[in-house]
Curated annotation (Swiss-Prot):
Name of the protein in its database record: U3-theraphotoxin-Hhn1l
A cellular component term, taken from the record's GO annotations: extracellular region
Pfam families found in the cross-reference section: Toxin_12 (PF07740)
UniProt note on tissues of expression: Expressed by the venom gland.
Superkingdom of the source species: Eukaryota
Organism field: Cyriopagopus hainanus (Chinese bird spider)
Compartment annotation: Secreted
Amino acid sequence: MVNMKASMFLTFAGLVLLFVVCYASESEEKEFPKEMLSSIFAVDNDFKQEERDCAGYMRECKGKLCCSGYVCSSRWKWCVLPAPWRR
């Protein structure tokens, strides 16, 4: 009888411990995406604030030179990829 009470107590304690570990793991997983998104947007804002001396793809090139690998379209005045059919 005592052995059965001890095994029931250990089983119950194990289930409680399992519940606590799962709850802690789940709460950490809920915070992870929020932290990841906030860090991504923080990095994105740093790049937006950076001023460039050249114009990137599909940017207006009237007052600026296009970045390397792009040419200024004579028709649209945008920086585009160089191609044989573009003059």
